[in-house]
């Protein structure tokens, strides 16, 4: 019921903050796996999220050259990855369509700015957050994602050649 005591609490914000549930979503962020946000970024600029975004608030420019990703495989990377948070409707479609588990939903909701235009465009440097951060805000989901990525990496490893038969 709407009138339950648990639902009718007053919080002295910003001194006190309610704990957000794990499945809450606000705005997307990019996950990186190493200590370097640029080198460890999971995004390979495939632009699927940009194409699928209903309000078209994601802007990606693919790099000209390839560089090794966090697994050592040469990949393209986003030279530019911007999200216009004044347009984003937090629908999570970008997260669902990403085949590389590179984009996830954040719990940060305090993104107000004094300026109206350029400050509401989140750049790649602002969007990149570590896998450790992802584990802190979505622990159950992050464990499952990491297990799936590890299983996929093991599956792609080449099988060692069999020893020649003696005879």
Describe the predicted segments one by one.
Residues 1-87, 96, 101-167:
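Non-ligating segments of multi-cofactor redox enzymes
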Residues 91:
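Basic, alpha-helical nucleic-acid-binding regions used in initiation and control of genome expression
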């Amino acid at each position: 019921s709407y009138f339950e005591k648990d639902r009718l609490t007053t919080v002295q914000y910003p001194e006190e903050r309610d704990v957000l549930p794990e499945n809450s979503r606000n705005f997307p962020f990019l996950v990186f796996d190493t200590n370097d946000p640029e080198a460890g970024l999971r995004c390979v600029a495939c632009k699927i999220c940009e194409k699928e975004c209903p309000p078209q608030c994601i802007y990606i420019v693919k790099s000209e050259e390839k560089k090794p990703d966090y697994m050592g495989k040469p990949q393209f990377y986003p030279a530019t990855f911007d999200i216009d948070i004044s347009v984003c409707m937090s629908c999570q479609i970008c997260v669902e369509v990403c085949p590389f588990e590179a984009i996830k939903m954040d719990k940060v909701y305090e993104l107000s700015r004094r300026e109206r235009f350029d400050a509401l465009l989140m750049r790649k440097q602002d969007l990149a957050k570590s896998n450790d951060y992802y584990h802190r805000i979505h622990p159950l989901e992050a464990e499952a994602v990491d297990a799936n990525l590890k299983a996929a990496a093991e599956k792609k490893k080449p099988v060692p050649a069999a020893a020649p038969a003696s005879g």
